[in-house]
Amino acid sequence: MATSSLCSSFTSQTCNPHSRPHRKTLTLPGSVFLCRQFHLNSPSVSKTRRIRTRQSGPVASLGGLLGGIFKGTDTGEATRKQYAAIVNTINGLEPKISALSDSELRDMTFASRERAQKGESLDSLLPEAFAVVREASKRVLGLRPFDVQLIGGMVLHKGEIAEMRTGEGKTLVAILPAYLNALVGKGVHVVTVNDYLARRDCEWVGQVPRFLGMKVGLIQQNMTSEQKKENYLCDITYVTNSELGFDFLRDNLATSVEELVIRGFNYCVIDEVDSILIDEARTPLIISGPAEKSSDQYFKAAKIADAFERDIHYTVDEKQKSVLLSEQGYEDAEEILAVKDLYDPREQWASFVINAIKAKELFLRDVNYIIRGKEVLIVDEFTGRVMQGRRWSDGLHQAVEAKEGLPIQNETVTLASISYQNFFLQFPKLCGMTGTAATEITEFESIYKLKVTIVPTNKPMIRKDESDVVFRATTGKWRAVVVEISRMNKTGRPVLVGTTSVEQSDSLSQQLKEAGILHEVLNAKPENVEREAEIVAQSGRLGAVTIATNMAGRGTDIILGGNAEFMARLKLREIMMPRVVKLVAEGEFVSVKKPPPSKTWKVNEKLFPCQLSNQNTELAEKAVQLAVKTWGKRSLTELEAEERLSYSCEKGPAQDEVIAELRNAFLEISKEYKVFTEEERKKVVAAGGLHVVGTERHESRRIDNQLRGRSGRQGDLGSSRFFLSLEDNIFRIFGGDRIQGLMRAFRVEDLPIESQMLTKALDEAQKKVENYFFDIRKQLFEYDEVLNSQRDRVYTERRRALQSVNLQSLLIEYAELTIDDILEANIGSDAPKESWDLDKLIAKIQQYCYLLTDLTPDLLLNECSDYEGLRSYLRLRGKEAYLQKRDIVEQQAPGLMKEAERFLILSNIDRLWKEHLQALKFVQQAVGLRGYAQRDPLIEYKLEGYNLFLEMMAQIRRNVIYSIYQFKPVLLKQDQDKMENQKSGKRNARPPTDTNPDPVGTVEPSTSASS
């Protein structure tokens, strides 16, 4: 389940201490801010820069606080030298590889695959493989990977993290090591942060390995198990981090081999690795099942929370995201609910009231979630996207639904869970790439054992990161932001404004409307999400103003002057989609996740740089008519049509006649648009390039750097500036008393603050937020490590039961160990023979297995001379009883026993593992208090968790063998009539269930008597 945080973070900037200070005056006619001046890069700030140092990274100061992280850091030249020899070898192979025909190039794959599978090392195959991929990319995509991209590929092949700047072609880089590592035949996973990027990368750069004879697969959320299995078996599979993790958990809940979809783990390339392994690592992946809860309690608690007042009835700790009822709060709640104790275990009102107050104070609409229809949808704080299908756990989501007056969905109980840390550590070889990893080198190396390597840029980065501007109050900050946007807009420079919430983006949008500034908004709201790629791709056009809620993982480059190819695709899409996408018939089932295509696909004409010529309009019409004739009028689903359009809008040869015609039209339209976008690009560059405005610091500096990195791609001109307020969440929550003192000292809202004390206070706040969230991730990892070893054991046992053809040996082992448990519980190993209570022992054994009716004290005394003899004899009888029961069932219903055994093992593992997870959650909450008794909570958790685990594994064995011993097939009359068919191998019996009697086989209640 996803959780959300109200905290933001910020970044330090390294500036030239010798730069000449300059003064800028920002004014907006008609504003309260009229004629107010604020001075940037003042001499006092420059002095501060000279004296402030940080051990952990770049110099921090007010005049560049949290600014350009890239200045003064490793430029990757050492990496360039390290790999220079191999790059030269690859370049030396280029003439030879270029001379090969397409089929000869494809044959290189088969030859390399054969060599790899015979044991030749991938390192020795690397130069040739990279040269082949480079040539294929040139032929298929029209892109020749630069030398620095080859270096990036080699870094990934070594199992390291490659830090590559935005716009350096990370998507293409991933193909190089993916192709090389796929040669061994064990599969490669390329992991992205969302479905859109997975599909885009598979359809675009996936053409390269496909052209070279490899199978490339794509996993999407709405696929069937069969489709997923087929795609996971491909040489290279594109998939999102969450879908891969959930498929792993679902595989470990499967009840038949046919339901398994994932092949074994081999090599994994993670795009935006910091977002996945750092930002999302605080929240484990959880698959939940429904649990019965009364919705009335949520609504009553919501009314109480609404009536209660902060600091009177309760206090709020925004840093810990917790609330605490005061004495008056307890008394008033108990009086309203007419209960004696909020913590009465029969009703447990306390959790409902606490969650209701959390929903009121800490989980805010259009910040942490949005409302769509009658659903509360979580907004990912790192990407600004809606997290479809994700819910907060422990009743919190229901509390938010009650607050909003929406229908309450059932509370959930955890069926399976895993942290991203432990999930990805299952890969024998793991690597990743991002534009912002340097800030988290320590965490990558300590938890994941991944080295971070800086890859040099192809062209020098010349973006100018301006000084940060800090105000006392948010009102002054937002006025200054509007002034900045207006000033840039007048020069024609495109502006990208980053906000941290939907609420902020809507508020700023309203202010820009009042100022008469045309703009686009990109946030989690449905009407904006649909146009995401369109909005981002055109953010670099002359005079464009774009407000975006977080830019992590957006995946679309902002090209100065506009993206001609993207516009050409939109034009072709506008013409084609209405004619080939089928309409949903009335009454036909429509997926909630995929609404019917009621839209027209019509694009605002202002988006296109020019009116399309008649010649290209006719070319597009002709291609679309051929598509309609070949595919059928309105015969495709929207997803199918989008996939075919994607294939059409690529470069390189196409075998299919329709795709070839559409591709030709796309290329011609692109050429026409490029004439205009190139002219516009020159104007944008002359104006200064893309200007990025940050409005608040996130808790992760990397997200701020990703926002900055949208400007200055591939050596483009650009600039960035952040506007901050002491009322921003990061300073308010983590700033401490010093920030509060500064807020009282500086009374003027509209003037920026310059103070060495402030610089130090903000620097400390930054360290606090980074350390705080690192500690959370580290603690989650440490606690999940305990669970991970248990999870591995349980999943191994479960997979053994699922995939074994014959479970006889496993069941005999269960029978013998259960007999051992009963014996040890009733007769001590050191007890003399004369003191054995055999009547009690026999009663307990016969309670488990009614077949052992012949056991008597005299028989045991005669057969067994000592304790070990007794153990061996009872083990033998337990085994014989199991084999006897197996024969009885097989005679009545051939083949049923195998199904019953598998079903009973899987169902008991799943049920008891679910209960174990709940128990561990309570243990983790309880051990936290033991720190006050000078006891390490983690060690306490390990000890108690281990004891609970041993008891759970024993209980699984006992329940299963008890159910097997008690199992009595009940045949229906038609089954008796068809006994002959059953004996010949045709079975009409269904597997038993552990709850309700089955028409064919029933299992007695498996609440086995405790030994």
UniProtKB/Swiss-Prot annotation:
Residues 1-59 form a transit peptide. ATP binds at residues 164-171. It is found in: Plastid, Chloroplast stroma; Plastid, Chloroplast thylakoid membrane. InterPro entries: Helicase_ATP-bd (IPR014001), P-loop_NTPase (IPR027417), SecA (IPR000185), SecA_CS (IPR020937), SecA_DEAD (IPR011115), SecA_motor_DEAD (IPR014018), SecA_preprotein_X-link_dom (IPR011130), SecA_SF2_C (IPR044722). One of its GO terms (molecular function) is chloroplast protein-transporting ATPase activity. Keywords: ATP-binding, Chloroplast, Membrane, Nucleotide-binding, Plastid, Protein transport, Thylakoid, Transit peptide, Translocase, Translocation, Transport. It is a peripheral membrane protein. It catalyses: ATP + H2O + chloroplast-proteinSide 1 = ADP + phosphate + chloroplast-proteinSide 2. Its main location: plastid. Its EC number is 7.4.2.4. Residues 1-22, 976-1011 are annotated as: Disordered. GO terms for biological process: intracellular protein transport; protein import; protein targeting; protein transmembrane transport. The keyword Transmembrane helix does not apply. CDD domains: DEXDc_SecA, SF2_C_secA. The keyword Electron transport does not apply. Residues 1-17 have a biased composition (Polar residues). One of its GO terms (cellular component) is chloroplast thylakoid membrane. Belongs to the SecA family. Has a central role in coupling the hydrolysis of ATP to the transfer of proteins across the thylakoid membrane. Facilitates the transport of precursor proteins from the chloroplast stroma to thylakoid lumen. This is Protein translocase subunit SecA, chloroplastic. The lineage of its organism: Eukaryota, Viridiplantae, Streptophyta, Embryophyta, Tracheophyta. The gene is SecA.
